[in-house]
Amino acid sequence: MHRSHPSISRRKHLMKEMMEDDYALPTETQQIARVISSRGNNLHEVETVDETFLVSMPNKFRKSMWVKRGDFLLVEPIEEGDKVKAEICKILTPEHIKEYTKAAIWPDKFTKKPVQEEATSQNKDDSDFEDDLLPNTNRPVNRDSSDEEEDEETSSEED
């Protein structure tokens, strides 16, 4: 008889739980938070609408679910912590965000800017960034086509 590794079955059950989620709305005590950074030891710095604090990853998520900067979480406050003020209840997926937005409980602070605004601000940033770049000394400098035409004219005059 073949037995699967315990962490594999735990991960499988967590993934199944996430997929079969009913997208229940947060309770009164739960908050929506965005991950700012990972602090190690299953601690993550998050921001909510009002404040920034640390949250802990519960044992059931450890080594099977990962969060990265910018991910959204549902957190529940814990009483025993000074620095660590909450524990992760749920890692929110784009489907959760869509449902929470429909229910009008998604914080305005976390609403994305319209695509057009992002593109124009990004283009401004890109052009500023390119202006600050030093020339690449590993490649020959491209000459303008107008310089080449002048060279051709001078060479034909010499003949």
UniProtKB/Swiss-Prot annotation:
GO terms for molecular function: RNA binding; translation initiation factor activity. Keywords: RNA-binding. Residues 146-159 have a biased composition (Acidic residues). It comes from the Eukaryota. Residues 18-93 form the S1-like domain. Coiled coil: none annotated. Gene3D superfamilies: Nucleic acid-binding proteins. This is Probable RNA-binding protein EIF1AD. It comes from Drosophila melanogaster.
